Curated annotation (Swiss-Prot):
Residues annotated as binding a divalent metal cation 1: 91, 195
One Pfam assignment: TatD_DNase
EC code: 3.1.21.-
Membrane-spanning ranges: none
Homology family: Belongs to the metallo-dependent hydrolases superfamily. TatD-type hydrolase family.
EC class: hydrolase
Protein name: Putative deoxyribonuclease TATDN1 homolog
Organism field: Encephalitozoon cuniculi (strain GB-M1)
Main location: nucleus
Cofactor(s) the protein needs: a divalent metal cation
Primary role: Putative deoxyribonuclease.
GO (cellular component) term, any one: cytosol
Keywords: Hydrolase, Metal-binding, Nuclease, Nucleus
């Protein structure tokens, strides 16, 4: 089985209504994939928690950096991060590519506030901000994953040295440099994701040549990304590095459960995958 650590289940492009969510979950189970739902703010975190309870999976809860300007504090989030289905605080961090949504000051303030909660695990967003990101997290003893990684090999190694995992998806293997980064990093430092409905491994991406499972014949998956497609990321890691596929799956599964702990482990058992 596989675990997709980043599923934007509240995004209408992924599932526009309740029946669409049911279909996404059905395809997950058919593909033996457990989805972790991603909270982006107070409202989406609440929805993710409720859906996680309904479908016996888990979620994150937090404030995405681009939502930072809408919050003067994080009081609304605190009860949510303590919910029994929440495995990590996040999505939180910094995003300097989209400062039109929230300035650097707001992002840093809300980021630090979430780190001050002292969570057991964090689901991080870091985009074009590595130096500031590292400066902030260096003040904390944390465990977590930097998801949708598109930085340099030097940045990845610095994050790993801090004790963080690297989350990779289609955007991570868009270029030949991205493939080389995947080859260079220890398998024990990787988690995989779709960030669905985004970050699909497109035909124009360098990573596409390492994909063996074709979802294009399924109408629902022709254009969008879904958590069931995370199998393609496992294939890219295996085929690009020359490592045995079963070893890749087993190692990344161990990494994921090791990071998220008993709450995720129990969810895996409930799904019976």
């Amino acid at each position: 089985m596989l675990i997709d650590i980043a599923v934007n289940i509240t995004d209408k492009l992924l599932a526009k209504d309740e029946s669409s969510v049911e279909e996404v979950i059905r395809r997950c189970k058919d593909s033996k994939v457990l989805p972790i739902f991603t909270g982006l703010d107070h409202q989406t975190s609440k929805i993710c928690i409720n859906l996680a309870k309904k479908y016996k999976t888990v979620s994150t809860a937090g404030i995405h950096p681009t939502s930072s300007s809408r919050y003067s504090n994080i009081d609304e989030i605190v009860p949510l991060v303590n919910d029994e289905t929440v495995v990590a605080i996040g999505e939180c961090g910094l995003d300097y590519d989209r400062l039109e949504f929230a300035d650097k000051v707001s992002q840093k303030r809300i980021f630090r506030s979430q780190l001050d909660l002292g969570g057991s695990c964090y689901f991080f967003h870091s985009r074009s901000c590595h130096r500031d990101f590292m400066e902030i997290v260096s003040d904390y003893r944390i465990r977590g994953v930097v998801h949708s990684f598109t930085g340099s090999i030097e940045e990845a190694r610095e994050l790993i040295k801090k004790g963080l995992f690297i989350g990779i998806n289609g955007c991570s293997v868009k270029t030949l440099e991205g493939i080389e980064i995947v080859r260079s990093l220890p398998l024990e430092s990787l988690l995989i994701e779709t960030d669905s409905p985004y970050c699909k491994i497109r035909r124009s991406y360098a990573g596409f040549e390492y994909v063996t499972t074709d979802f294009s014949q399924q109408k629902a998956l022709k254009k969008k990304n879904e958590p069931c497609c995370v199998v393609q990321m496992a294939e890219v890691v295996s085929n690009a590095t020359g490592k045995d596929y079963d070893l890749v799956v087993e190692t990344i599964l161990d990494n994921t459960i090791g990071l998220y702990g008993d709450v995720l482990k129990k969810s895996v058992e409930r799904w019976g995958l």
